[in-house]
Amino acid sequence: MKSNANQIHTHISASHKWFDLKLDEVWRYRDLIILFTKRSFAVSYKQTILGPLWLFINPFLTSIVYIILFGNIAKLSTDGLPQILFYLASNALWSLFSVCLTNNASTFTGNAGLFGKIYFPRLTVPISNVFTAIIRFGITMSMVLVILAFYCITGAVTPNWIYWLLIPFILIWIGALGMECGIIISSMTTKYRDLSVLVSFGVSLWMYATPVVYPLSQLPEGMLKTIIEINPVSAPIELFRFAVLGKGTIVPWSIALSAGFTAIVGLLAIVVFNKVERSFIDTV
């Protein structure tokens, strides 16, 4: 009888290491992450007429609404940038964060049936949600790049090309922050279902406390501007616009604060995730 030397054996035991993410195990299940990513992307546009075209239509129509409401009616400045480009780029990165947060906010409650049937590293689900959000972001950004090329040719926009090297780090930064917040919320919703109702409302409010529809440079000095700068999502949004569009306010202490906040929330998310994944199936 021949034995399969490449067969993977998974040993399941009680873990008492609060900061152990079992990343080696997650790596062994990387094919499952790819499968979850494909499934999530496919399900999003299943039984729709236009399918993934909504990734172009939705942000474009949203930007048109922003132009009418915030540009023409509220007369908010876009830092001298073309309005359509300002809103499209800002909304693309914000959508990456909000999708990572909202999709991961239902990690435990939305996958309870699957988690209860078979064992696999639970972390594969939130990671796949981030990958799905990044794919959506990439598709939307292809439209932004076409419009950006037009305005670069006309001389209306001059990107800071060297800062484009930071874009992958910005995506990891804001994707990780969204995933961490989502995991913490998901852990809490296993006992308090009311929180799931408040997530979309809270994310909407959070957007207006973030320089998405307005540039940070247009805010007057004072408490309001300081609060916006403390917002951990503000720094990556402004840094992203500075790189891609050539206009953005870089506040070093705000960047450091946001990076530190992301690290601390990440540690908290690990502890909460490891604690809840052991017993959540009995409470969901």
Task: Report the location of each language-model feature.
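Hydrophobic transmembrane alpha-helices and immediately adjacent juxtamembrane helices
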Residues: M1-V284
